[in-house]
């Protein structure tokens, strides 16, 4: 059984201008004292076509963590616009929150993000080069995709079964309009569970 349960993630400052920081209020519970840190990350998927455009916006270590319920606000700067392909700047993408313990990812929470112009003229006739100052980011907070992975919480050298800690299925969270190209996002994995918070 997992020693950490994520109870809630609240998306703050949503919708917001593209350049605003991402803010998530994360509530989790530890079933027992954890002697080592939890590592939380926020990852922005810059393009569904290649992982090379994924940006780790921030990473924070929390711990050691005593048993009980905990809450913190995780804030990360907006992605570096120069690292996003111009063709992927407007439209739907994904932001991921991951958590690892002893180097093993045990939960991945994904949200669809829609980047669009608020100005009607720009929406109907978008500029060839994205105008990030005019883009609004809207996170679909009501429908997160959650994937849980079985990990070895004790940190022993014994190996977990291969099917219990594998990457999610390819393209499981790509919007229907995207063509398959990589497997950056969430999906169902045997012996793991995926649900909504």
Swiss-Prot record:
Principal localisation: nucleus
Keywords associated with the record: Chaperone, Chromatin regulator, Nucleus, Transcription, Transcription regulation
GO (cellular component) term, any one: chromatin
Leader sequence segment: none
One GO process term, biological-process aspect: DNA replication-dependent chromatin assembly
Any one GO MF annotation of this record: histone binding
Compartments it resides in: Nucleus
SUPFAM superfamilies in alphabetical order: ASF1-like
Domain of life: Eukaryota
Protein task: Histone chaperone that facilitates histone deposition and histone exchange and removal during nucleosome assembly and disassembly.
Subunit description: Interacts with histone H3 and histone H4.
Family under the similarity heading: Belongs to the ASF1 family.
Protein's recorded name: Histone chaperone asf1b-A
